[in-house]
C-alpha cells in the first residue's frame, strides 16, 4: 500500500465496502457522539467520514487529534445505515472504520477558522492565506479559475489560435497607468518595465507573419487601489488576428466566450447573439458604456414635452441652452409616492438637487399622473410622456435635466438604483454585449488639450483623411468593449498599422514624429516593412471568473492577492532592499516629500 494513501478523500463508494484502505488529509472537524468519535477528513478532492469507537485500536490516537492536523488513517470501509446516509457528500454512503491513525503534522491554534464560512478581517485572511485557501468556497473558486483558463485555452485552440509568450521585462510605454520599473544592474541608471499589457509585442507578432496569437498574459499596473481591480497584477486572455475586420473579431470571440460562460454558468442563461451597441447609444439609453442589460430600464429623451411647459425650471433650461436635454428613466411598478420620495432622497445624497418624477395611478376608472411635475406640465403632456415610454397604472418615471455629457453618469446610476430597488434585475443570467464605435479622442480638462480616449494604437474610422479633415472630438475608433452584467470584461480594436496615420494620430495629442519614434520605436519601425491589417482584444480573466462564481470581489478568486494598500501581507512585500542590493543597482533611496 502507498505510504500515504490508496484513495483520496472523495474516492470511496459503496462498491468499496469491505476493503481496507488508506487515506490522508486534514482534520476538518471532530464530533463526539456518545463516546463514538467521528472525524471528517478532508483533502483537495473531498471529505470522508471516519469512525473510531472505544473498541477501535485507533481510538486513543483519535482522541488526541484536533482541527487542521494532517493525519493518515488506515481503516475498513463500511456502509452507512440508511438513516445516516448523507446525499450531500460524494462519499455519503460509506464511512471508514479507523484501525490505525498516524499524525503527519500537528497544527497550532488557528488564527482564523477554516470550517464554515464566517466573515473575518481581510488582513488576517490575507496574512494567513494558506489557511484561508482551505475554506470550501475559496478553494472551489481557485479550482474553478484554473478550469476556466483551461477551457479558454481549449476553445482558442479549437478556432485556430496558437499560444505564444511575450517578454515580461520590457520598455516603459505610456498606456494609461504607471509602470512598475525594474532597475538594470548591467546598465546603471536605466530601467526595464513590467508590461501593462503585451500590446506592442502581439502587434509585432502579426507584422512578423504569425496569425491568431493568444496567451494567458500577466499584466502589471502601478495604480491606486480600486474596488474593481486587483492592485499590482492581473491576468487577461490576450489575442490578436491578422487580415481581419472588427466584425471578424466579434464573430470569433462572441461565440467562443459564450461557450466558455455556458460551460461554467451552472444552467444560467447566457447571451448567444451578442448585441452590438454603439457607444453613443449606450450612453443615451443606459447612461454607461458598460450597461447591465439584465436591467430592463431604457432611458429616453423627452425634451419636447417640457419645452415651453408650465414646469419653469426645465422649460427655462431648454430655452436658454440648446444643448440641454431632459432624459426620462421609466420605472415600471415604481408608482408610489413613497418609492419616488426615496429615489429623490437618494439623488440628494449623491450631491444632486433632486430627482423629478411622475407616477401614474387609476382613480375613478381614469389613469392620472401624480406628483409636482404632472401638476405643472398638465394632463396632455403627462399623458404624452406616458404613451412614449409605454407606462401604465402603478408605474413611475424619473427625470434628469441638463447637458447630457455632464449628467449621463448620474442618470445611469439612477437607472441602476431604480432597477435594483424594484427588483427588476434578473440576477440568474449572463447578459453579454459589444459596445462599439468609441470616441477616438476626448478633451482633457486637467491638461486642457485633446487626448486619446482609450487605446492610442486603434485605427480611427476614416483613417488619415479623418485625422486631417475632421474635428478630433467627432472621430470614432474601430474600438470595442465586451460587457457582461454591467462589467467590462474585454477591450479591443482594429489596430492602426500605417506609420503615417500613427504619427498623425499622436500629433493630435501633442506628440511629434520624433516622440513616436522614441516611445514606440519598435512598432513604428516594424510598420514600415509591411504590416498586415490586424486587430484583437484582451479578456479580463479575473473579472470573468468573479462573475461566473458570484464572488463579491476579485480577491475571492485570486490565489495570493495583495490587500487594498498594495501589500502582500503573507510574504511581506513590498520590503526594503539591502544596502548591498542597492549598491549593485547604483540606486540610493530618497525619502518621499511630505505633502502639506
Swiss-Prot record:
This protein's record includes keyword RNA-binding: no
CDD domains named in the record: AspRS_core, EcAspRS_like_N
Sequence positions that bind L-aspartate: 175, 221, 454, 495
Keywords (A to Z) from UniProt: Aminoacyl-tRNA synthetase, ATP-binding, Cytoplasm, Ligase, Nucleotide-binding, Protein biosynthesis
Region (Aspartate): 199-202
Enzyme class per UniProt: ligase
Signal peptide: none
GO MF: aspartate-tRNA ligase activity; aspartate-tRNA(Asn) ligase activity; ATP binding; nucleic acid binding
Residues engaged in binding ATP: 221-223, 488, 540-543
Record GO biological process: aspartyl-tRNA aminoacylation
Keyword Translocase found: no
Subunit structure: Homodimer.
Listed name of the protein: Aspartate--tRNA(Asp/Asn) ligase
Species of the source: Rhizobium leguminosarum bv. trifolii (strain WSM2304)
Designated gene of the protein: aspS
Amino acid at each position: 500500500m502507498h505510504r500515504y494513501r490508496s484513495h483520496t478523500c472523495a474516492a470511496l463508494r459503496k462498491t468499496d465496502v469491505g476493503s481496507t484502505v488508506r487515506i490522508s488529509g486534514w482534520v476538518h472537524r471532530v464530533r463526539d457522539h456518545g463516546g463514538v468519535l467521528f472525524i471528517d477528513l478532508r483533502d483537495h478532492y473531498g471529505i470522508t467520514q471516519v469512525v473510531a469507537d472505544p473498541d477501535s485500536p485507533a481510538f486513543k490516537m483519535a482522541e488526541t487529534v484536533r482541527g487542521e492536523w494532517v493525519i493518515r488513517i488506515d481503516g475498513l470501509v463500511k456502509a452507512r445505515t440508511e438513516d445516516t446516509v448523507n446525499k450531500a457528500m460524494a462519499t455519503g454512503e460509506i464511512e471508514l472504520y479507523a484501525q490505525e491513525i498516524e499524525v503527519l503534522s500537528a497544527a497550532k491554534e488557528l488564527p482564523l477558522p477554516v470550517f464554515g464560512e464566517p466573515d473575518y478581517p481581510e488582513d488576517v485572511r490575507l496574512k494567513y492565506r494558506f489557511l484561508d485557501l482551505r475554506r470550501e468556497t475559496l478553494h472551489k473558486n481557485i479550482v474553478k479559475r484554473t478550469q476556466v483558463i483551461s477551457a479558454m485555452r481549449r476553445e482558442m485552440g479549437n478556432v485556430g489560435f496558437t499560444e505564444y509568450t511575450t517578454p515580461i521585462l520590457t520598455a516603459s510605454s505610456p498606456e494609461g497607468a504607471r509602470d512598475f520599473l525594474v532597475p538594470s544592474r548591467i546598465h546603471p541608471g536605466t530601467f526595464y518595465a513590467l508590461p501593462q499589457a503585451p500590446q506592442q509585442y502581439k502587434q509585432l507578432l502579426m507584422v512578423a507573419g504569425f496569425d491568431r496569437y493568444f496567451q494567458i498574459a500577466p499584466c502589471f499596473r502601478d495604480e491606486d487601489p480600486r474596488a474593481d481591480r486587483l492592485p499590482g497584477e492581473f491576468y487577461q486572455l490576450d489575442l490578436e488576428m491578422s487580415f481581419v475586420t472588427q466584425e471578424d473579431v466579434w464573430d470569433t470571440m462572441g461565440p467562443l466566450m459564450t461557450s466558455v460562460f455556458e460551460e461554467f454558468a451552472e444552467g444560467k442563461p447566457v447571451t448567444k447573439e451578442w448585441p452590438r451597441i454603439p457607444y453613443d447609444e449606450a450612453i443615451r439609453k443606459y447612461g454607461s458604456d458598460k450597461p447591465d442589460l439584465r436591467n430592463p430600464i431604457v432611458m429616453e429623451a423627452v425634451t419636447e414635452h417640457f419645452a415651453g411647459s408650465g414646469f419653469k425650471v426645465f422649460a427655462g433650461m431648454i430655452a436658454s441652452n440648446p444643448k440641454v436635454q431632459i432624459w426620462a428613466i421609466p420605472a415600471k411598478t415604481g408608482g408610489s409616492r413613497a418609492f419616488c420620495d426615496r429615489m429623490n432622497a437618494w439623488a440628494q445624497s449623491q450631491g444632486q438637487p433632486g430627482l423629478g418624477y411622475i407616477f401614474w395611478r387609476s382613480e375613478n376608472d381614469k389613469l392620472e399622473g401624480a406628483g409636482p411635475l404632472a401638476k405643472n406640465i398638465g394632463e396632455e403632456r403627462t399623458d404624452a410622456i406616458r404613451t412614449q415610454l409605454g407606462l401604465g397604472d402603478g408605474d413611475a418615471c424619473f427625470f434628469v435635466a441638463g447637458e447630457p455629457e455632464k449628467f449621463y453618469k448620474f442618470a445611469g446610476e439612477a437607472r441602476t438604483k431604480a432597477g435594483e430597488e424594484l427588483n427588476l434585475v434578473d440576477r440568474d443570467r449572463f447578459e453579454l454585449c459589444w459596445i462599439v464605435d468609441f470616441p477616438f479622442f476626448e478633451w482633457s480638462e486637467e491638461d486642457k488639450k485633446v487626448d486619446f480616449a482609450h487605446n492610442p494604437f486603434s485605427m480611427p474610422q476614416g483613417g488619415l483623411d479623418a485625422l486631417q479633415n475632421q474635428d478630433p472630438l467627432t472621430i470614432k475608433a474601430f474600438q470595442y468593449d465586451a460587457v457582461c452584467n454591467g462589467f467590462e470584461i474585454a477591450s479591443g480594436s482594429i489596430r492602426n498599422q500605417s506609420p503615417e496615420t500613427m504619427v498623425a494620430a499622436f500629433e493630435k495629442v501633442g506628440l511629434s514624429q520624433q516622440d513616436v519614434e522614441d516611445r514606440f520605436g519598435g512598432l513604428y519601425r516594424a510598420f514600415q516593412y509591411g504590416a498586415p491589417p490586424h486587430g484583437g482584444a484582451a479578456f479580463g480573466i479575473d473579472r470573468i471568473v468573479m462573475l461566473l462564481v458570484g464572488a463579491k470581489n476579485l480577491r475571492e478568486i485570486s490565489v495570493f492577492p495583495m490587500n487594498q494598500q498594495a501589500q502582500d501581507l503573507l510574504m511581506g512585500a513590498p520590503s526594503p532592499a539591502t544596502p548591498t542590493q542597492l549598491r549593485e543597482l547604483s540606486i540610493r533611496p530618497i525619502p518621499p516629500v511630505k505633502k502639506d
